[in-house]
Every structure is written in structure tokens, then in C-alpha cells.
């Protein structure tokens, strides 16, 4: 077989030469590139070992894809290039093709080598009936490690491609799947660090660079990248404030490690360490950190300790320089001090509920694991100087009520923090007896309680080990099966943490002062003081810091009765955008006096919230490209209702259930409110005004990132994609919901038409009262927005799940054009059938959908009935299908009457791509339905959101299970797919920046994947902390090749685009999309780029249907198709030319 492979290699060299031959035209180069891809794919499939020896996989990426991507990016970045928009379109198409190639290659590798990856989508889910392999006898069977490597390679490059397309949430999903597949390989961690860096989350950036280095196979570029990041931190000014916020602490913490890692200015270590210890204690007692941040801080310390001294062979004597000894001493002192404070923190809060007390315990567990592996550390002088740690540890262990059987009950089930640290060299021996293959499936029943108990048992076991080996520190007595830890060391009494409450007030009042100071880009601004301190008395929240990518879901509110998100205005200083609340003026006034209003009782209530301190700069400086919010709900509030979960990085149990894993519980869904509110003012922007993308960006996203946006398809030129059309869940400015908005899962699932009208009218009344309240957000629009006619989506034309509902004056409901096969109905009747179907439409499509806030519209919670459990079987797809079909047809036929859906606005030129993309609702439905099949979720799973294993990983049962919990005052927030510690985001959220919103060529992280972005990203990060991680086979909302490749001709509109799918795969998302176009369509006059948008949309369908192997004839097909459309008289469907 090697002879044939050698022949393939020779052919590949010829093709590579052709691709670089300047004499050949684009068509010849394209043909050579396609041939090279096919050739390398054959080699990888038939003789993988030989191909890997020859680095075929690297040549495939570099020559067939990366070089061309880099070339197109360079051309598109040149603003003087007259063909810039065409280059961006070509880049978009090429990235689409590259993603399709690697998806198909991964699928073929899994099939040929019979690799059953947790992230793999079975062929049956893709509509492939059989996988007959020809020439199977010619395939050389590779080693399993080689199979894992090549699959990880595909996943990493799929993540890179998604990152170039600014689909950061999808990129993160690919990287995490890759890291889970081979935890000992450092490359996926490096890529995750790049994503974190692009968002400005430096804690997560440093954490993942450390993870990328401290593995068996470190990624070479990670060390350089870490040095750059730490050097940039050292360049920032020193903090002079006496009382730090969490962002100040993290900034100083990173500087401390910069001094140690780079051995610079070591004289600053000791005073900086003392300040860190002091502020860490104060902030921890304020509950300002979340579990994830504490573990990341601990792991960074362990990485540095491991880096300074290799304990692999403790029998050898090593000599260390004076600087090395100084760094070691200061770092070990910091580590031990932090450990003592972590042990003391739960004891200081004995009145708190037990589950909350566990929030520092994961970091304690990680720290104790390391000490157990390094017994010589107990002899260090800095450890002896901190003997006050051991009485606190003893008190903590005794609070677990240890029994003798705890020492013998050995569980191989990994805890979430152990999943997070798979392959981490500093702790690797501690994890050798754990079984990572089952994910969290080893625990059934009360996962939260069992995991808490497992952690306690492991801590008790470590305590017993210390008692056996260091009796001078700890002794253990056995009293009739009960263990009692004792020590002769006196316990150090700390001051009452009431000072922390005072500090909280001071911290809140200083927030406004620090807003201006932290507005500059760079590490300083990124790590600026947490602006999202809950100034709102109602929330009872703590100030909290978050790192943008690191934290997807915010720390949950422990007190469900006080789950109001903080109400404040989020500003993007770099873009001049202010995202205002819907109840803006009232809440703006409240913000000025909230601190004064907070009583001591409220502060005590605040003390009960485990809040991840969220850096306000998350919204200010993250600069997420504007359209990601459509994928990710905007939930910036650190303490939302206790449905928040967060994301372990890589373990099989953390990924959405797939058909290949029937045992996985279904994911959690939050049913959106059946009534869509109009969110914006009634103001119509003039045609020449460029509206910031924040007004155009919907919040919700679908499972696994495959939300098919109404009015948005994949092949729109990047220059047209930033001001994207509304997503299926949103309308108007709500897409960038400020944290002040209340989740609205408490809306009745089937309200009467009357209540619907009331709520709508109430929303309209607010609009009319302040018709221009969103106008201050106009500020400056990013430069690349200027080419578009943007508008504010202020009315019901964006109501995607209830398109027929029009917002008119009270008692005035505009009639909707009826489908030809429906009898005429009273328009008010149209509301009633439309209320129920959208619930099921959204349920499967919006895993982490943020329900619409209710407080701004209905201030009397008693007016809204609490729904029955929204996963009730009454929401059967079969029950609603006919009504949804009517709804969809109504939508389609009513969508071209702007007067109906925009009664309060003058026609505004629509963006050209919206027009072209809404021409084929059936195509949208086809995409959506095929996407659902990719996710692998069955209808049963979609209907039972309460069973997700991710609910139960850490913390409370995050899915509300009673009517009371769904009341407006405690409306649960959506849950993330990946949950670790209760309420605290665990692994980096990398808050999905907007996919497709920035031209790939302009992305700050679109160049070399291993390079650290030297400057903050230029795109606008709206607060979209959630990320959607679907099965790897699941394309992002623009990866639609799978849908199109099954059909050449799109079904007619009446066919709903599901003619080729089975009933199971054509689940609710297809129906959801059927009703989408009416919500986003408004016919307006021609615009400059209409024709190009239509061309791109048509070319996309041709491209995709040809199995991602486009040839030079694609343009000819496109022209033919355009001519046929005009001849068929589809003038109303196409934008005017």
C-alpha cells in the first residue's frame, strides 16, 4: 500500500506546484486545489499511518486551505481594494467549503475506522441510509491513537474555520470536543486560549495557555503566547486603590505570575503577594468569586509551582538559583495562604445553605490533591509559617461528619473539576484511578448530592493521609466508626466578615468612578473593575467578575425569590454604543440611588448569593461582533434564576445527547413566552443613518449553534453580514437585552388573546412614551457598518414565533392576509392558534433561549398565570402541527405588506441580504429541519428538559419544577448545556461573539491560530455569555451544506421544506422556520447590493448541493438560475434589480 501512497505523494507535489504557479488562472488553481484535497483524503483514509508519517494532514490544511484563507483575508483587509466585497464573499464561500470538507472527512474517518466519538453524528441522522465502503480490503488499519489524533486534527481545524468565520461559539464547541478526545495534546487548549484572548478574558487565557503547556504533548506556540500575555500584563500600571474589585484582583494576580514566569522585577513579589492575600480574603468572604474562577486561580498557581520545580523525581537533589528560590518561596506562600482562606470561607458562612458552602470546595480539593502528591512541601518554611491553615482544614473536614466508611468508599467517578483538569501534569497521578469514559453517567439519581458527597469523601481521605504522614499537623481519632480530626495548633480567629459587607457598598459606589478609567483597550481595560456589581437592591447580588469567554452562564442566584437581574446600562465605549433598557429612564434613575436604598437586610441577602463577579467590561470591552447574540442569549446578569449552569470543558457527559449515546438524558430547554413583545421605540431611522448592530442583533440561539436565522443564510458577503437580520427568537433592540430584563418563562404557555393584547398594548404604550429612548445608543457605528441601510427593529415585524400578531393601537389589530385554503377568520382568532405552536417551535430550537423579560411590560405579576410544566406532553408536536402549518402559511402570505407589520414606521430600505434571504422560506425550513437531524435530538428528548444531566452536575436542581418557581419574581433563566458547579460557570464560556458579524478578514483572531492577538478585537462584544455546544456534526447556523446536499431543487413553499426528511428529523425547528419569514420580511425599495445578495444566496445553494466541491461551472449555474427565476415571474420574491 505504501507504493500507492508514495505515488499519491508525488502527484500531490505536482498539484502543489500548480497551485503556486502564477501563470495558471483561477479556474486551474481551483481545480488543482480540489484534486489535492481528494488526493490527501484518499491517503488519510486508506493508509493513515503512512500519511501521518509524511505529515499529510498538515500539508492538507496548509496548502489546500490555510494559504488560500490567508491570501483572501489579506485582500479583504485592504480597504483600498475596489473588489473588497467580492473578496469577502469569496472568503465566506471558501470557508464554507473548508468546513464542509473537514466535516465530511471526519465523518468518513469515523465510518471507515469504526470510531465512535461522543461528538460524532451517526450517518442515519444525516439521512445516509447505508455506509457501504468500496475497496475496504485496501485500507490499512491504523492504531487507535492515530485515529484519535486525526479526528482531533479535524475537530481543531473545524474550530479554526469557525473562528475565521467569527462563529466563536461553534469554534469553542469544536475545540472542546477535540480536547476531550485527546486530553494529553495541548493544541485544543491553545486554541481555546486564543478565543478567550479575543474576548479579553485574560484569566481564562492564562489558564488555557497553562493547560496547553502542562500536558504530555505541549503545543509549542503556547509558551510563546503565554509569555506575550504575561508581558502585556506587566506593562499595565499598578493598582493603587486600597480596596479592589475582583477585576483588580485578577489583574494583580496575573501581574504576580508575570513577575514569576518572566523573572522580572522580583522585588515587587513580596508586597504584591501580601496585597493579593489580603484582598483575596476580603473578596472571598464577599462571595465575589465563583467556583470556576477559584479553580482557575488555583490551577495557575499549581502550573507555576510545577514549572519552577519538577517533582517527577523527588529523590534527586536540585540546586536552584537565588531568583528561582525567591519565586518558589513567594509562590508557595501565596498558594498556601489561598488554601487557608478557601478552607476558612465555608466556616465563616455557617448560616448559609449547605450547597452554597461547597462553592470553594472544588478549589480546596484541587489544592489538596497537589499537596498529597508533593509530601516534601510540608517541610517548607513557608508552610510551617502558615500552620493556622490546619485548624481551619480540620474544622472543614469535621463539618462533613466523617465516618470510617468514607475512607473505604472509593468512587471512580470524576468530579467536574477533575474533568476540567484531565491531562494536567501537575495533578495527573491523582486522576489515574478515575474513569473518564462515562462522563457523569456513573451517577444516577441525586447527582448534586452524590457529587458533593464524593468530594467530601475525597477530602476526608486526603485529611486522613495528612494525619498519617504529618501527625504534628493533624491527628485523626476513630470513635465507634466516626472520625474526628484534631490538632494542637490553636485556631486563628478572623475578623467578622461584616467588613466585607461594608466593602461591598464601597465597591458599588466606586463603580461609576472607575467606568471612565477602565475604558482603554488592552489588559487593563479588559480586566477592569466589575461593572456588573448588582446595584439593584432587588437582586441581592454580589459584585462579581467574569471573564468573557470564560464564563458562559453567570453565577446563579441562590435565593430564587430574588432573581431579578441587575438593571443597568451597558456601554461599549469603543463603539460609542449604549444599550438601553426597555424601561430605561425609570431604571436609570434607580441606578443612581440603588446603593442608598439597599438596606442591611438586603446586603445580608446579598451575602447569600453565590455570584460570579462579572467584569462590566464584558459588555464594554468585549466587542463581540454584533450578530452572535442571535446565537447566544444575552444574559449578563451574574445572578440569574437558579437555572444557570456552566460548562465543563471536556468530558463525554458534557456533550449533548446523541443517538449514539441513548443513555444520555435529554438537554434542558426553556420554553419561550408565547407572546412576543415589541421592544423598541416607534422611531424610524432615516435612510442614511447607520444603526449600530446592537439594534439588529437577536439574543436567542438554537441548540448546538444551528439556529437557522430567518433572513440570514451562510453565503452572504461578509460586508453585508454585520447588521444581520433578526434571529428566530427576537425582534428589535431586544436582541441585546440589558441585564435588567427579566426572563419570562413565567408567561402562560397558552394565554388568552385578551391577555396577549394587553401585554402588547402595554409594551406599545411604553414605546410611545419614549419613542426615541434607544436613540442614544446610536453613538458611532463601526466603520464596516456604514455601507448598509440599517434600521431599528421596533415593532412586531420581528416577532418570529408569533408573526401574525401585529402591534397596533389598543383594540386595533391589523388583519393578516389569509392563506388561500383557510376560511376567513376574525383576526383576533389568529392570535389564539398562534400562541401554542410557537412554544414547541422554540423548545427544541432554543436550548439556551433567553425568554423575554416581563417586568417592563407587565408590572403586576398576578396578571400573568404561571404555566404548567412546560415539558408537559400536551406540547406534542403532533398536536400543534396543523395549526403551525396554518401559521406558517399565514406568515408567508402576509409578509409582503409592510403596512401590516410596521404600522408605526415609514418604510425603511431593508438590507439587501434580508430581502434575498427571505425569498425562499421553504429553503430556510429545509435547512432548519436538516439541522435538527444533525443535532441528533429526538422529539422525546426535546420535550423533557428537566432530565438533562447537565442540570444536575453541580448545585441545585436547576430546572424549575413547580409553579411557584416560575413566578415572575423568580423566572428561571435558561440553562447551559454544560453545568459544573451550581450556578457558577465552570469552563470558559468564551461568550460567543457574533458569528458572521465581522468579515473574516477583519477578525482580530483570524490569522495564525497559534498567535496571540496583539490588540483587542475591533468587533463589538455584546453581552452574550452563553455558548452553544452541540454535537460536532451539528453545523453552526450557517453550516447548511448538509441540508442542501440532499436536494437540488428546493421544495415549493407549501411543502415546508421537509419533503425529503423523515418525521423524526423534521422536528419543530422546521416548523419554526416556516413561520419566520413573515416576521422579518418587509418589502422596500431597491438597494445597491440587492443583486449581489441574491447572487450569493443562489450560489450558496448551488455550492452546497454539489457536496462542497464547487467547480468553475457554479457561476454559470447561478446565472442560469437567475434567468429562470425572472422568467418564472418571481419578481415579488426577488429584490428588484
From Swiss-Prot:
The keyword rRNA-binding does not apply. GO terms for molecular function: protein phosphatase 2A binding; telomerase RNA binding; telomeric DNA binding. Its main location: cytoplasm. GO terms for cellular component: cytoplasm; cytosol; nucleus; telomerase holoenzyme complex. The modification N-acetylserine is found at residue 2. Residues 620-646, 696-794, 890-911, 988-1055, 1069-1089, 1104-1137 are annotated as: Disordered. Keywords: Acetylation, Cytoplasm, Nonsense-mediated mRNA decay, Nucleus, Phosphoprotein, Repeat, TPR repeat. GO terms for biological process: mRNA export from nucleus; nuclear-transcribed mRNA catabolic process, nonsense-mediated decay; regulation of dephosphorylation. Residues 620-631, 1036-1050 have a biased composition (Basic and acidic residues). Residues 633-646, 696-722, 988-998, 1069-1081 have a biased composition (Polar residues). It is found in: Cytoplasm; Nucleus. TPR repeats lie at residues 152-185, 187-219. Residues 723-770, 999-1025, 1117-1131 have a biased composition (Low complexity). SUPFAM superfamilies: TPR-like. The keyword Nucleotide-binding does not apply. The modification Phosphothreonine is found at residue 624. InterPro entries: DNA/RNA-bd_Est1-type, Est1-like_N, Est1/Ebs1-like, TPR-like_helical_dom_sf. The modification Phosphoserine is found at residues 520, 781, 897. It holds the Pfam family EST1_DNA_bind. Plays a role in nonsense-mediated mRNA decay. Recruits UPF1 to cytoplasmic mRNA decay bodies. Together with SMG5 is thought to provide a link to the mRNA degradation machinery involving exonucleolytic pathways, and to serve as an adapter for UPF1 to protein phosphatase 2A (PP2A), thereby triggering UPF1 dephosphorylation. Part of a complex that contains SMG5, SMG7, PPP2CA, a short isoform of UPF3A (isoform UPF3AS, but not isoform UPF3AL) and phosphorylated UPF1. Interacts with DHX34; the interaction is RNA-independent. This is Nonsense-mediated mRNA decay factor SMG7. It comes from Homo sapiens. The lineage of its organism: Eukaryota, Metazoa, Chordata, Craniata, Vertebrata.
Amino acid at each position: 500500500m505504501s507504493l500507492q501512497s508514495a505515488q499519491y505523494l508525488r502527484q500531490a507535489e505536482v498539484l502543489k506546484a500548480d497551485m503556486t504557479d502564477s501563470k495558471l488562472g483561477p479556474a486551474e488553481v481551483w481545480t488543482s486545489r480540489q484534486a489535492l484535497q481528494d488526493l490527501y483524503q484518499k491517503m488519510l483514509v486508506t493508509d493513515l499511518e503512512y500519511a501521518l508519517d509524511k505529515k499529510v494532514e498538515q500539508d492538507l490544511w496548509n496548502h489546500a486551505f490555510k494559504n488560500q484563507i490567508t491570501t483572501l483575508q489579506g485582500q479583504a483587509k485592504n480597504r483600498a481594494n475596489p473588489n473588497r466585497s467580492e473578496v469577502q464573499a469569496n472568503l465566506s464561500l471558501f470557508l464554507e467549503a473548508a468546513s464542509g470538507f473537514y466535516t465530511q472527512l471526519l465523518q468518513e474517518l469515523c465510518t471507515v475506522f469504526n470510531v465512535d466519538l461522543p461528538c460524532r453524528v451517526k450517518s442515519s441522522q444525516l439521512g445516509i441510509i447505508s455506509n457501504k465502503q468500496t475497496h475496504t480490503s485496501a485500507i490499512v488499519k491504523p492504531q487507535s491513537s492515530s485515529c484519535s489524533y486525526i479526528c482531533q486534527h479535524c475537530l481543531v481545524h473545524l474550530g479554526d474555520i469557525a473562528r475565521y468565520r467569527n462563529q466563536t461559539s461553534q469554534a469553542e464547541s469544536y475545540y472542546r470536543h477535540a480536547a476531550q478526545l485527546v486530553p494529553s495534546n495541548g493544541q485544543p487548549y491553545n486554541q481555546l486560549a486564543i478565543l478567550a484572548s479575543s474576548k479579553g478574558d485574560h484569566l481564562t487565557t492564562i489558564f488555557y495557555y497553562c493547560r496547553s503547556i502542562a500536558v504530555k504533548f505541549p503545543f509549542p506556540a503556547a509558551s510563546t503566547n503565554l509569555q506575550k500575555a504575561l508581558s502585556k500584563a506587566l506593562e499595565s500600571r499598578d493598582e493603587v486603590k486600597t480596596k479592589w474589585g475582583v477585576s483588580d484582583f485578577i489583574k494583580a494576580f496575573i501581574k504576580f505570575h508575570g513577575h514569576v514566569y518572566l523573572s522580572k522585577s522580583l522585588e515587587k513579589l513580596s508586597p504584591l503577594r501580601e496585597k493579593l492575600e489580603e484582598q483575596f480574603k476580603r473578596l472571598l468572604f464577599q462571595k465575589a468569586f465563583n467556583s470556576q474562577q477559584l479553580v482557575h486561580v488555583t490551577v495557575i498557581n499549581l502550573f507555576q509551582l510545577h514549572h519552577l520545580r519538577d517533582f517527577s523525581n523527588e529523590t534527586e537533589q536540585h540546586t536552584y538559583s537565588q531568583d528561582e528560590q525567591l519565586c518558589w518561596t513567594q509562590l508557595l506562600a501565596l498558594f498556601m495562604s489561598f488554601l487557608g482562606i478557601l478552607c476558612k470561607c465555608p466556616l465563616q458562612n455557617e448560616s448559609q445553605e449547605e450547597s452554597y458552602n461547597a462553592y470553594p470546595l472544588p478549589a480546596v480539593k484541587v489544592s489538596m490533591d497537589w499537596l498529597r502528591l508533593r509530601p516534601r512541601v510540608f517541610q517548607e518554611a513557608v508552610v510551617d509559617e502558615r500552620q493556622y491553615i490546619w485548624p481551619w482544614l480540620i474544622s472543614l473536614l469535621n463539618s462533613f461528619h466523617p465516618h470510617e466508611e468514607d475512607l473505604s468508599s472509593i468512587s471512580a467517578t470524576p468530579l467536574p473539576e477533575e474533568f476540567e483538569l484531565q491531562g494536567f501534569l501537575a495533578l495527573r497521578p491523582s486522576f489515574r484511578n478515575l474513569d473518564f469514559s462515562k462522563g457523569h453517567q456513573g451517577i444516577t439519581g441525586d447527582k448534586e448530592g452524590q457529587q458533593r458527597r464524593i468530594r467530601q469523601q475525597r477530602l476526608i481521605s486526603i485529611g486522613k493521609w495528612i494525619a498519617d504522614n504529618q501527625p504534628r499537623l493533624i491527628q485523626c481519632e476513630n470513635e465507634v466508626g466516626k472520625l474526628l480530626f484534631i490538632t494542637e495548633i490553636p485556631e486563628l480567629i478572623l475578623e467578622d466578615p461584616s467588613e466585607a459587607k461594608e466593602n461591598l457598598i464601597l465597591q458599588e459606589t466606586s463603580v461609576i468612578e472607575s467606568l471612565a478609567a477602565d475604558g482603554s483597550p488592552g489588559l487593563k481595560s479588559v480586566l477592569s473593575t466589575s461593572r456588573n456589581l448588582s446595584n439593584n437592591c432587588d437582586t441581592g447580588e454580589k459584585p462579581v467578575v467574569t471573564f468573557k469567554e470564560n464564563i458562559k452562564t453567570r453565577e446563579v442566584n441562590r435565593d430564587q425569590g430574588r432573581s431579578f437581574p441587575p438593571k443597568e446600562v451597558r456601554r461599549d465605549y469603543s463603539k460609542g454604543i449604549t444599550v438601553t433598557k426597555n424601561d430605561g429612564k425609570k431604571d436609570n434613575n434607580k441606578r443612581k440611588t440603588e446603593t442608598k436604598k439597599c438596606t442591611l437586610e438586603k446586603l445580608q441577602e446579598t451575602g447569600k448569593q453565590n455570584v460570579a463577579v462579572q467584569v462590566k467590561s464584558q459588555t464594554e470591552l468585549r466587542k463581540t461582533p454584533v450578530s452572535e447574540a442571535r446565537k447566544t442569549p444575552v444574559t449578563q446578569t451574574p445572578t440569574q434564576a437558579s437555572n444557570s449552569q456552566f460548562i465543563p470543558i471536556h468530558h463525554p457527559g458534557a456533550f449533548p445527547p446523541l443517538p449514539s449515546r441513548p443513555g444520555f438524558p435529554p438537554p434542558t430547554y426553556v420554553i419561550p413566552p408565547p407572546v412576543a413583545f415589541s421592544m423598541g421605540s416607534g422611531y424610524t431611522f432615516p435612510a442614511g443613518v447607520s444603526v449600530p448592530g446592537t439594534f439588529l442583533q437577536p439574543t436567542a440561539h438554537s441548540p448546538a449553534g444551528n439556529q437557522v436565522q430567518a433572513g440570514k443564510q451562510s453565503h452572504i458577503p461578509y460586508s453585508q453580514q454585520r447588521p444581520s437580520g433578526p434571529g428566530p427568537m427576537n425582534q428589535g433592540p431586544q436582541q441585546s437585552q440589558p441585564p435588567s430584563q427579566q426572563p419570562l418563562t413565567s408567561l402562560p404557555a397558552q394565554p388568552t388573546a385578551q391577555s396577549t393584547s394587553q401585554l402588547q398594548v402595554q409594551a406599545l404604550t411604553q414605546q410611545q412614551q419614549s419613542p426615541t429612548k434607544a436613540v442614544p445608543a446610536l453613538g458611532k457605528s463601526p466603520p464596516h457598518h456604514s455601507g448598509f441601510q440599517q434600521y431599528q427593529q421596533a415593532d412586531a415585524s420581528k416577532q418570529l414565533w408569533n408573526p401574525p400578531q401585529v402591534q397596533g393601537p389598543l383594540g386595533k389589530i391589523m388583519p393578516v392576509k389569509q392563506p388561500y385554503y383557510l376560511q376567513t377568520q376574525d383576526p383576533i382568532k389568529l392570535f389564539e392558534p398562534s400562541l401554542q405552536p410557537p412554544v414547541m417551535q422554540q423548545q427544541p430550537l432554543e436550548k439556551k433561549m433567553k425568554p423575554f423579560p416581563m417586568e417592563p411590560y407587565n408590572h403586576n405579576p398576578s396578571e400573568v398565570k404561571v404555566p404548567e410544566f412546560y415539558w408537559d406532553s400536551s406540547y406534542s408536536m403532533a398536536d400543534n402541527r396543523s395549526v403551525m402549518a396554518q401559521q406558517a402559511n399565514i406568515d408567508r402570505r402576509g409578509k409582503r405588506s409592510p403596512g401590516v407589520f410596521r404600522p408605526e414606521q415609514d418604510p425603511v430600505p431593508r438590507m439587501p441580504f434580508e430581502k434575498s434571504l427571505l425569498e425562499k422560506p421553504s429553503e430556510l425550513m429545509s435547512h432548519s429541519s436538516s439541522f435538527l437531524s444533525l443535532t441528533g435530538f429526538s422529539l422525546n428528548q426535546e420535550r423533557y428538559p428537566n432530565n438533562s444531566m447537565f442540570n444536575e452536575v453541580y448545585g441545585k436542581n436547576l430546572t424549575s419544577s413547580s409553579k411557584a418557581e416560575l413566578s415572575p419574581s423568580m423566572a428561571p433563566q435558561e440553562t447551559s448545556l454544560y453545568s459544573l458547579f451550581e450556578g457558577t460557570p465552570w469552563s470558559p464560556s468564551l461568550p460567543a461573539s457574533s458569528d458572521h458579524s465581522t468579515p473574516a478578514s477583519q477578525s482580530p483572531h483570524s490569522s495564525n491560530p497559534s498567535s496571540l492577538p496583539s490588540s483587542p478585537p475591533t468587533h463589538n462584544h455584546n453581552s452574550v455569555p452563553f455558548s452553544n455546544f452541540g454535537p460536532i456534526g451539528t453545523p453552526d447556523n450557517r453550516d447548511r451544506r448538509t441540508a442542501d446536499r440532499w436536494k437540488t431543487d428546493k421544495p415549493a413553499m407549501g411543502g415546508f421544506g421537509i419533503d425529503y426528511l423523515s418525521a423524526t428529523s423534521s422536528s419543530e425547528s422546521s416548523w419554526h422556520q416556516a413561520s419566520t419569514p413573515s416576521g422579518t420580511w418587509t418589502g422596500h425599495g431597491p438597494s445597491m447590493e440587492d443583486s449581489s445578495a441574491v447572487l450569493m444566496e443562489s450560489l450558496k445553494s448551488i455550492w452546497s448541493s454539489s457536496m462542497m466541491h464547487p467547480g468553475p461551472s457554479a457561476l454559470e449555474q447561478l446565472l442560469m438560475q437567475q434567468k429562470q427565476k425572472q422568467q418564472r415571474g418571481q419578481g415579488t420574491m426577488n429584490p428588484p434589480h
